[in-house]
Amino acid sequence: RLIREKLLESQMASEADFLEPQPADDRAVLLVHTEEWVRKLKTGTLTPLDIQRMEVPYSPELVRAVWLSAGGSILAARRALADRVAVNIGGGFHHAFPSHGEGFCVLHDVAIAICKLQADGAIERALTVDLDVHHGNGTAFIFARDESVFTFSMHQEHNYPLEKPPSDLDI
């Protein structure tokens, strides 16, 4: 909400620029995440290790929020195809893995959007450009063997996460 308010206040965006996403459907989420991880999130049956890795407290509201974020990234990707540019200001959870959350990231919204658009035939290939100070370890892991997605991460070397699976290009 704060980002939206600042964008409006600075006149970098108007109310008409904002779209309200719907939560991603489970079929889209399951293109990236395991059935077990989705079940744990939906039923609240996470283990202490699951919660420790996520680094955020579990709640039903959290589950609604991450499904909404994934829906926002799908919507932004579709709008970018139509309008040449779009942003999900509530996304970018690049530490989420298929079978667990990590580093404040529960679902990998960007990977879900890419895989959903590929499954729908809207795109064949994708490029992820990750300029966060932290390496996008979830992104690198998810797309490690997928030649249709090129992963680029520019990050601080000696920072979270400790283990950094290689992206296609790391700087």
Q: Residue ranges of each PLM-predicted region?
A:
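HDAC/HDAC-like amidohydrolase catalytic core signature
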Residues: 1-171
